[in-house]
Amino acid sequence: GFIGSNLVRLLVSRGHQILNIDKLTYAGNLQSLTSIEENPRYQFVNADICDADKMTELVADFQPDKIMHLAAESHVDRSVDAPGEFIQTNIVGTFNLLNAARSYFESSSNKNFMFHHISTDEVFGSLGDDGFFTEETSYDPRSPYSASKASSDHLVRAWGETYGLPIVVTNCSNNYGPNQHKEKLIPTIIRKAVAGEPIPIYGDGKNVRDWLYVKDHCVGIKKAIDTGRLGETYNIGGRNER
């Protein structure tokens, strides 16, 4: 995926050994990782997080120090037309991965293990005319996508509280940058402008988003998993409202 491929390249460049699990839906593209595909520290497995047995097998075999969970259906408009896919991947898939992580953690002597759930500020709903979302902002999802991500956030925290799974959650604003799928807003605007086609306007055209460069986001993800406190939530934004 978009954020995941940028994160994998960063982690491999810093000497980490990576197992990359991806279902390779329409939004996945292995060409994003051609620069590291032959790296001995990198391994790719084509698998679906909705396959509970496969997740348990892969986690047990790889014996990770950290699990960084970025697998998700993420297009808001598609979630309106086909919400079932979002429920399955974002909620059931997260449940499966949490159970695989719990099984591994409880049978392992690895005291450095952590499950890092990467989420979105969409779970907070609309911000209003000013201010910022904070880690204390109440959840107010407005679409099947954001509702499914909110559900997955709560599942992760519940596994931390109920089973003692070492977890951390990060919620990010809108990412942009290399390898982003063409359906997203900035690639769509660029593509339409280059082709001389009308640029789509959403709502009354007054909506404002915070934009976060994907490589900056990846640095923030790395910071959270390296120094974040167990059980905490961290918002990652760009302070770049447009």
Predicted stretch roles:
Residues 1-175, 195, 215:
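N-terminal Rossmann-like NAD(P)+-binding domain of SDR-like oxidoreductases, especially those catalyzing
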Residues 150, 175-188, 195-197, 202, ...:
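Glycine/proline-rich active-site loop of Rossmann-fold NAD(P)-dependent oxidoreductases
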Residues 122-124, 207, 241-242:
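Active-site/binding-pocket entry motifs
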Residues 169, 211, 241-242:
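Short aromatic/basic micro-patch
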Residues 54, 180, 211:
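Short acidic, gly/pro-rich beta-turn/loop elements at beta-sheet edges
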